[in-house]
Amino acid sequence: VTHSHYDHVGGFDDLRPFCGNEDMPIYLRADVNADLHRRLDYCFREHPYPGVPTFKMNIIDNNPFYINGLKIVPVEVMHGKLPIYGYRIGKFAYITDASHISEEEKEKLENLDVLIINSLRDKPHFAHFSFDQAMDMIRDLSPKRAYLTHLCHEAGCHTELESRVPAGVSPAYDGQIVLSTR
């Protein structure tokens, strides 16, 4: 989980059909865990109501961890004044809701095949990269492919955005599948 804002965790209750009789593993910061326990307290009771999604919360910090042998590297970024995580998995990185990435954290994003990064709109925003800021970050990091995500209604339509980006950069869309190698 990147952070606890509702647009990133609001679907937790909809995970019911995927939990079955086992707790779904979730990896997150301690502060995000505390927020989710407050908001979704019914999921963490000793005897939850039948059918309620249940989770196994795995607290992580800004150090690599492994899931079934796959190395996951948290990348701390700033979402306004809020520190949140993006993630690098192999040569793939997912960064959303970022407004700043420190030089130290950028080092974790070197030599990427695929970068997915937020680009809210043209107009600057205190907590999200604008289109120009996202494009600057893409130029700075030089991934082989980049996808713009977390686009708001002010970003323009998909075909308009496609005409504004250079080769190797695309606006992402809901349901898109992006492949990358380890």
Predicted regions located by residue number:
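Binuclear metal-dependent hydrolase catalytic cores
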Residues: V1-I95, L161-R182
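Structured catalytic/translocation cores of nucleotide/phosphate-coupled proteins
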Residues: H3, G10-R16, L115, A134-M135, ...
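A broad detector of the eukaryotic-type serine/threonine protein kinase catalytic domain
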Residues: P17, L120-R121
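Short, acidic Gly/Pro/Ser/Thr-rich loop/turn segments
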Residues: A34, K81-L82, I101, D122-P124
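Active-site-proximal loop/helix segments of hydrolase catalytic cores
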Residues: M78-K81, G90-N118
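Binuclear metal-ion centers of metallo-dependent hydrolases, dominated by the metallo-beta-lactamase
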Residues: S102-V114, R121-R182
